[in-house]
Amino acid sequence: IQNMSQTGSWKDINATGESGLIDKNVFSVWINHGLNPENASYQYIVVPDKSINAFRDLAEQIDFYIAQNDGSVQAIREGNKYGFVFYKSASTKMDDGLVISSDKPSIVFIEKKGNTYTIAVSDPTYTQANVTLTLNKKMIEKSGVTITEQGNNIIFTLPVGDYVGSSVVDVFTEK
């Protein structure tokens, strides 16, 4: 654990960021995995702004299903909410039968209510013009933002400029 002053600019981590230097206290936490760990894994959640008692209560109630946690995909479900980190083009299957693929690195969040899916997609690499998700569901586009649909392939057009890396969100209904 570390809390120390660090200096840098937003441009250091984002090509469209401002180049002026900023000096702020930065809190860091890390786990020392040792040298060359083999077949080692761990999982964790971040729970900000909770007292120790609130955290204990939450820990007793949480019921996560972890479908995959490797170098290709991190996939988790809690109730009707799904979270995915695709490190490369990959596919994963959840315990309730949902199968999802991404053609590129992406971060995806899905919330399912009945036959309606709210899907949020972002590009952690800040380099992609679009991401295609393939689901084992046929969807009807419910709201028309910058997303086109082809069968069970949903193509998300990603933001550029000042908004690069931000999420694109749309709502779909299963056919």
Residue ranges and their predicted role:
Residues I1-S28, K93-M94, V99-I100, M139-K142, ...:
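Trp/Gly-enriched beta-strand surface patches
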Residues S5-Q6, V26, S41, N130-L135, ...:
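C-terminal amphipathic "assembly/sorting" segment characterized by alternating charged
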Residues G17-S19, N32, F64:
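Short, flexible coil/linker segments at or flanking structured domains
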Residues D23-N39:
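A surface-exposed beta-strand-loop module
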Residues V47-K175:
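Non-catalytic terminal regions with compositionally biased, polar/charged low complexity
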